[in-house]
């Protein structure tokens, strides 16, 4: 059965989603989870784009050994040099070069003739191949390119040393029939095509990214590029979990397989959703909250008699536990440590102690601690390594239907002093945020506020996501707590601390903070 390589670009193309700005610890945590998922290649970022991206790509390349790590580069020498410096310590250093090949891109964006584009592509591939054993070359906007020209430039870059050829549907324009024909055309018209692997990369502007990816595989693609939860620029990218499960469930049709560990899919999806702040829709295939829910009485009756009547995917296949209660207030440290290690924890003893303390605090308030609860507590610790300049000490809110909502907060300041302030608002959250703004003594513009429960039930943990403009920088923050108001305050301060850390990072490395 033909093996399909899975190329995950969550940390590069996925991070280009509007409002997503992952910090160093968050990128590392996602990369380690992608390794546990079994992806073949992790596109860790664009090393030449910023010092922050360079450092995170370098760290991921040095840490991750179970998956190959790659970075994006334009067809210019300085980008290739930056990629090499970031990736040379990787287990299998590889680079991802690109240049546009469609008439509209060549004329209006590149302002180059087709001949100049071929020359530039060949020059960059030769230079990259002198350092990297694996050179992937992408024809940006391939689906809107002239096929004879595309075949010509592909042959040229193969001769120059490319080992993987990627044909992206950059703007989500093509259809399954068209993309299959494109791959078949290249297989038939590029003399050296059998010397390389073919890759597909599809965007979801017309809602066909997954369908196009599967059609490309039928047309001869050996590698599929995708993101967790389908996140990405504009309408997003092809969804890794949907492609992976489709290839698994329909092996009879596609006659291919991947090396993914499917039971890690739900955990990976939840992690990416939490760290990016991009909520997974309830009706999302494979990982949505309703993916295995049956409302119709006829459907429920059928599932009770035989699950296969209406469930082609079992929850267990993708890591959705049917019995999610795992620990309680009387659980000991050994059982706790075993469970968090099962969930993928690889942190320090100090982090483990902090998670155990948070677990015990939660267990006093919540009778049943689920895997989702534990995973949320674990994530808070493993990606919370940034300096907290402002720390919430106490929070008290007075609320009543006929009263003025008032919040009183004590907070530890960067100086080490503890300050107290109070303010009112039309609602409890507004009162909290008005109080925090007074303590910060700086204007804050709240751009987005979202809340969701991590598990069901009235005692569920709350997860709050905010996006704000603070000191001219747009940052996001997250907060998790048993109480939604406490989670709201934590999310606010998390965003503030992230802004300060980003500015300090920029001062050290001389890189511009994007506004």
Curated annotation (Swiss-Prot):
Q: In what pathway does it function?
A: Amino-acid biosynthesis; L-leucine biosynthesis; L-leucine from 3-methyl-2-oxobutanoate: step 1/4
Q: What does this protein do?
A: Catalyzes the condensation of the acetyl group of acetyl-CoA with 3-methyl-2-oxobutanoate (2-ketoisovalerate) to form 3-carboxy-3-hydroxy-4-methylpentanoate (2-isopropylmalate).
Q: Which reaction is recorded as catalysed by this protein?
A: 3-methyl-2-oxobutanoate + acetyl-CoA + H2O = (2S)-2-isopropylmalate + CoA + H(+)
Q: Which UniProt keywords apply?
A: Amino-acid biosynthesis, Branched-chain amino acid biosynthesis, Cytoplasm, Leucine biosynthesis, Manganese, Metal-binding, Transferase
Boundaries of each Pyruvate carboxyltransferase domain copy?
4-266
Know the name of this protein? 2-isopropylmalate synthase
What does UniProt list as this organism's lineage?
Bacteria, Bacillati, Bacillota, Bacilli, Bacillales
Instruction: Please name the gene that encodes this protein.
Output: leuA
InterPro entries from the xrefs? 2-IPM_HCS-like (IPR050073), 2-isopropylmalate_synth_dimer (IPR013709), AIPM/Hcit_synth_CS (IPR002034), Aldolase_TIM (IPR013785), LeuA/HCS_post-cat (IPR054691), LeuA_allosteric_dom_sf (IPR036230), LeuA_bact_synth (IPR005671), PYR_CT (IPR000891)
Q: Where is the region Regulatory domain?
A: 391-515
Which principal EC class is assigned to this enzyme? Answer: transferase
Q: Where in or outside the cell is it found? A: Cytoplasm
| Annotated Gene Ontology cellular component terms | cytoplasm
Organism the protein comes from = Halalkalibacterium halodurans (strain ATCC BAA-125 / DSM 18197 / FERM 7344 / JCM 9153 / C-125) (Bacillus halodurans)
Taxonomically, the superkingdom here is Bacteria
Q: Does the keyword Mitochondrion apply?
A: no
Residues annotated to bind Mn(2+): 13, 201, 203, 237
Subunit structure of this chain's protein: Homodimer.
